[in-house]
Regions:
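A short local loop/turn or secondary-structure capping micro-motif enriched for an aromatic residue
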Residues: 51, 94-97, 125-128
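Short, low-complexity N-terminal intrinsically disordered segments enriched in polar/charged residues
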Residues: 1-37, 128
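C-terminal-biased regions
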Residues: 1-7, 68-69, 84-85, 116
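Short beta-strand edge/turn micro-motifs at domain boundaries
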Residues: 101-128
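Surface-exposed, charged secondary-structure patches
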Residues: 11, 46, 55-98
Length: 128
């Protein structure tokens, strides 16, 4: 298996950038597009465990659009072969004033319709 094929890495990096832009702008349509529409897709959030695309979609639709802006740091995207990738990043929000750091990991898989997130985990810890 080849790791970090340049063309595949570029594709996933572009999709990750689309996700980040959609997230901070609360573009729910793009966020929904980027998660796999499947009952096995999951997202472990800061305060919720979401099982299945429908639960993820409902969470996004109900979430407040206020306070979503963030900056990312130490983003690492690794591809495995041509159809699987993991994206990991740290993120910060101004409201945290340096006291907390968020962590996000996503597993991406290439399907006929394109790259989709099949699993995601978001958490926040105190910054030391």
């Amino acid at each position: 298996m080849e790791i970090d094929l340049p063309d595949v890495l570029a594709e996933v990096t572009a999709q990750f950038a689309r996700y980040e832009k959609a997230l901070v702008n609360n573009d729910v349509a793009v966020l929904d597009e980027l998660f796999r529409n499947d009952s096995r897709t999951l997202r472990y959030g800061i305060g919720e465990n979401l099982y299945g695309f429908d639960a993820i979609m409902a969470f996004r639709a109900a979430r407040s659009p206020v306070g979503l802006m963030r900056t990312t740091d130490r983003t690492v995207i690794t591809t495995y072969g041509r159809d699987t990738a993991v994206a990991s990043t740290l993120f910060y929000r101004d409201a945290w004033a340096g006291s907390k750091v968020g962590r996000q990991m996503q597993t991406w898989v290439r399907f006929p319709e394109g790259w989709r997130i099949v699993a995601a985990h978001v958490s926040i810890i105190d910054q030391s």
